[in-house]
């Protein structure tokens, strides 16, 4: 049975389809990565406020590229990560022989705190993965300074937070490198797709090389010359500088992205308004509502019990199922990633107790927030939830 209130909706509208049809109707058009991809990358860089953007096949691929670059620059070591995040924030690390170190999140932004990061740093620490969960900003000046003072590689995962801001700047412009997801149902979509961003020219070369088999073809002339001079016996067109992947996207996805980005700001505005309505009408004695909403670009509507209560949480889930409202337990990525079985055969570390992450895992969920969700619909659901 179709959900009355789905978790995500299809962002594709007729305008996007018309753009695709117009592109497909051109004579001798190239479908693989070409001019439209480069145009989309340029527009995305301007929108986020970064120097460079590289279009790829998914946000998760971006996590692999960013982790691979961190390893190239810093070598193997420990990387501080949030337990509340997506699997691809952690899986690339263990696959690359690095060690994820989980520290607890705060409730206000569902992100790791400066104090918890400080307590986890040691001589083996090489980086921090900062996840902007559910549209909440996770960055601050103290965190940026902490990373810089300790010479740590700072990754920003912005896959759920397109357009979130800190001090007037969009997230994804603060770290060494950042990624975004354009999967179905996100703030905007390219059907499948993602973007990796940086302000660093060297990292930009790395991103392009890791995107396409590790080849130097798309790298800067300086990088090409370096490898040509060092390895004169190699064909410059087939010089593989890093152990790369094939994570390219194509022109069709870029055409959709170029159409979608025109509506991105208005879509975000609607999401933010819906979150405000949601938090203003929930019973604050029953549900946590004190989120740091400044500069948010809400991805979905969080619903976390204020106090542990298994019976009440089950009753909330029963109500949502009865109302035919789709939801996911544990918020982003199913809750506490350190409790997932994929880690059992790999080395990882938990620094301190994950009190908030476990509470979110056991007593939290989220429901959909998108342009089709109406304010009266939100108010009606809040009234019912407040009676549970």
Feature roles, as predicted:
Residues 64, 68-72, 145, 184, ...:
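Short, well-ordered alpha-helices that flank and scaffold nucleotide-derived cofactor binding pockets
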Residues 156-190, 205, 236-239:
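Conserved active-site segment immediately N-terminal to the catalytic lysine
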Residues 189-193, 257:
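Adenylate-forming
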Residues 181, 194-199, 229:
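Short beta-strand-to-turn element immediately C-terminal to the catalytic PLP-Schiff-base lysine
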Residues 71-158, 165:
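PLP-dependent aminotransferase-like
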Residues 30-31, 35-78, 92-94, 102-104, ...:
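Phosphate-binding glycine-rich loop
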Residues 9-10, 35-43, 47-54, 115, ...:
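PLP-dependent aminotransferase class I/II
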Residues 1-30, 35, 239-241, 368:
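N-terminal "arm"/small-domain region of PLP-dependent enzymes with the aminotransferase-like
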């Amino acid at each position: 049975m179709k959900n009355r209130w789905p978790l995500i909706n299809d962002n594709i509208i007729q305008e996007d389809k018309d753009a695709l049809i117009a592109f497909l109707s051109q004579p001798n058009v190239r479908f693989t990565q070409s001019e439209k991809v480069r145009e989309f990358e340029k527009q995305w860089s301007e929108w986020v406020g970064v120097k460079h953007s590289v279009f790829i096949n998914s946000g998760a691929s971006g996590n692999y590229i960013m982790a691979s670059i961190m390893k190239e620059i810093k070598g193997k070591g420990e990387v501080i990560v949030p337990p509340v995040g997506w699997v691809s924030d952690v899986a690339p690390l263990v696959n690359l022989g690095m060690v994820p170190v989980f520290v607890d999140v705060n409730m206000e932004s569902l992100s790791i705190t400066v104090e918890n990061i400080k307590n986890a740093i040691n001589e083996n620490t090489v980086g921090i993965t900062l996840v902007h969960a559910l549209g909440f900003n996770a960055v601050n000046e103290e965190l940026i300074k902490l990373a810089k003072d300790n010479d740590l590689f700072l990754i920003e995962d912005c896959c759920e937070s397109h357009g979130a801001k800190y001090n007037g700047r969009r997230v994804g412009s603060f770290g060494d490198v950042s990624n975004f997801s354009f999967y179905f149902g996100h703030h905007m979509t390219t059907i499948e797709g993602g973007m990796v961003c940086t302000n660093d020219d060297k990292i930009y070369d790395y991103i392009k090389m890791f995107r396409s088999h590790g080849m130097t073809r798309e790298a800067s002339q300086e990088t090409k010359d370096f490898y040509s001079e060092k390895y004169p016996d190699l064909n410059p067109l087939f010089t593989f500088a890093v152990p790369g992947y094939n994570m390219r996207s194509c022109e069709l996805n870029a055409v959709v992205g170029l159409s979608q980005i025109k509506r991105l700001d208005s879509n975000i505005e609607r999401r933010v308004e819906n979150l405000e309505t949601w938090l203003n009408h929930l019973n604050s004695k029953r549900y946590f509502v004190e989120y740091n909403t400044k500069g948010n670009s809400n991805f979905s509507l969080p619903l976390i019990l204020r106090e542990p209560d298994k019976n009440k949480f089950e009753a909330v889930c029963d109500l949502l199922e009865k109302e035919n409202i789709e939801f996911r337990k544990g918020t982003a990525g199913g809750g506490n990633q350190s409790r997932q079985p994929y880690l059992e055969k790999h080395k990882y570390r938990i620094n301190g107790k994950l009190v908030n992450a476990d509470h979110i895992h056991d007593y939290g969920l989220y429901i959909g927030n998108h342009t089709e969700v109406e304010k009266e619909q939100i108010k009606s659901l809040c009234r019912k939830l407040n009676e549970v």
